[in-house]
């Protein structure tokens, strides 16, 4: 299940991180599973999800996803999260363990944006990130009443501190230029029915370039067979 390896997130230097992903053939380019890459395209077979679309809260992609940026998060113990962002802010997230080749992939998840919040002052920011704030409670409820249970630290029956980590986002694989985004995040989820896929809710307070937002994304598991990578 998504999230099992993401409790030990920690930061890594941008140049050091890029070096870890460099191909032997071309040290300026990132190694990446399944040939997912900036400028590449992904068609996702959404039929398995559309069978249950009336229960899903996520917006399913209607068109080919063109990868415009790549993000990297180091988990420690040989684990990395690779994020592939489309222009519409949909995201394919891939977890790899002990390597970055196809055989090292543990999980693939599709996330689509649900809602953005823009805290205007310290008090509003604290509503999300302070102790007992919205990010970290045992449940998260959408405006329509849909409730998600906390997945990270699900063995804790009270508030849990959001997971803090840094993500390095690149728009040019041949350049060291990048954005560093600081996250305070928590993963939630719900079972649609016993025989249906889980739906995830990723809530992240993000700060970068003197900006602060709270991003809520909804996701589902993907199988490699559901993706056509071009």
Predicted regions located by residue number:
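Mixed-charge, low-complexity intrinsically disordered regions
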Residues: 1-63, 70-230
């Amino acid at each position: 299940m998504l999230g099992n390896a993401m409790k030990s997130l920690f930061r890594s230097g941008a140049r050091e991180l890029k070096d870890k992903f460099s191909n032997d053939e071309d040290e300026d380019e990132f190694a990446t599973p399944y040939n997912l890459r900036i400028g590449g395209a992904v068609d996702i077979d959404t039929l398995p999800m559309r069978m249950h679309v009336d229960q899903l809260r996520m917006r399913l992609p209607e068109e080919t996803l063109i990868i415009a940026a790549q993000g990297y998060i180091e988990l420690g113990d040989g684990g990395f999260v690779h994020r592939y962002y489309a222009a519409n802010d949909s995201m394919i997230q891939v977890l790899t363990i002990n390597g970055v080749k196809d055989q090292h992939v543990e999980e693939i998840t599709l996330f689509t944006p649900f809602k953005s919040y823009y805290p205007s002052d310290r008090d509003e920011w604290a509503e999300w990130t302070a102790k007992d704030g919205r990010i970290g409670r045992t449940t998260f409820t959408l405006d329509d009443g849909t409730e998600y249970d906390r997945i990270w630290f699900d063995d804790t029956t009270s508030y849990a501190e959001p997971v803090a980590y840094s993500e390095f986002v690149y728009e040019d694989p041949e350049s060291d230029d990048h954005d560093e985004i600081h996250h305070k995040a928590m993963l939630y989820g719900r079972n649609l029915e016993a025989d249906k896929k889980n739906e995830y809710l990723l809530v992240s307070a993000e700060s970068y370039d003197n900006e602060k937002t709270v991003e809520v994304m909804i996701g589902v598991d993907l199988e490699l067979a559901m993706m056509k990578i071009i």
